């Protein structure tokens, strides 16, 4: 990930990847295989960590399996962070399914999904439950994976840490 720049002065593991394969799921599974640490951040290149992101994690703690942070669009509005996919109370409007962003204290995890652009996981979770490499970006690979993992693991919202989008993205979710 990130290109072949000289990383000798940093603790970075460059992972070569044939871009013609085009599978985001394969790339993320390769990150898991090559990870040196227990906590792994999965994020697309259009996200950036806030300056106090790491301090927020130190304050939040390490008692989780899967974790999300606040995600902000360029204009400061919420983006797909604490996503609800199929809660009958919120997500169905005249028979159409919709994604909503509830308050951060929402805890009905069986109705949630983790958007594939950014999340944090313990390495053991991803080793036990890798992304389905038969699916790719835009094929609900994140929804399929979320529905497998969320019933089994502790998923928590860290409101002390924040990431921001480097480019404007359409929300496609209703903020409650």
Feature map (PLM): residue ranges:
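Conserved catalytic core of nucleotide-sugar-dependent glycosyltransferases
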Residues: 50-130
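Acidic donor-binding segment of Leloir-type glycosyltransferases
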Residues: 1-21
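Active-site acidic short loop of glycosyltransferases
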Residues: 35-38, 131
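Nucleotide-sugar-dependent glycosyltransferase catalytic core
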Residues: 22, 78-87, 137-138, 164-176
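Acidic donor-binding loop at a coil-to-helix junction in glycosyltransferase catalytic cores
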Residues: 137-145
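Catalytic donor-sugar/metal-binding loop of nucleotide-sugar-dependent glycosyltransferases
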Residues: 146-163
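Glycine-rich, basic loop-to-helix element that forms the pyrophosphate-binding segment
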Residues: 18-35
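Short beta-strand-to-loop acidic/aromatic patch adjacent to the donor-nucleotide binding site
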Residues: 37-48
């Amino acid at each position: 990930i990130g290109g072949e720049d000289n990383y000798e002065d940093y603790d970075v593991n460059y992972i070569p990847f044939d871009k013609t394969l085009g599978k985001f799921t394969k790339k993320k599974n390769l990150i898991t295989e090559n990870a040196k640490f227990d906590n792994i951040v999965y994020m697309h290149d259009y996200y950036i960590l806030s300056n106090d992101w790491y301090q927020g994690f130190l304050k939040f703690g390490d008692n989780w399996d899967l974790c999300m942070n606040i995600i902000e669009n360029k204009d400061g509005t919420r983006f797909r962070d604490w996503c609800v996919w199929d809660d009958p109370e919120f997500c169905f409007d005249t028979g159409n399914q919709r994604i909503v962003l509830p308050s951060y204290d929402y805890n009905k995890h069986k109705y949630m999904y983790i958007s594939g652009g950014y999340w944090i996981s313990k390495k053991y979770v991803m080793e036990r439950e890798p992304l389905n490499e038969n699916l790719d970006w835009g094929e609900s690979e994140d929804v399929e994976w979320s529905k497998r993992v969320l019933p089994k693991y502790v998923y928590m919202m860290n409101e002390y840490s924040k990431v921001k989008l480097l480019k404007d993205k359409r929300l496609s979710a209703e903020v409650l």
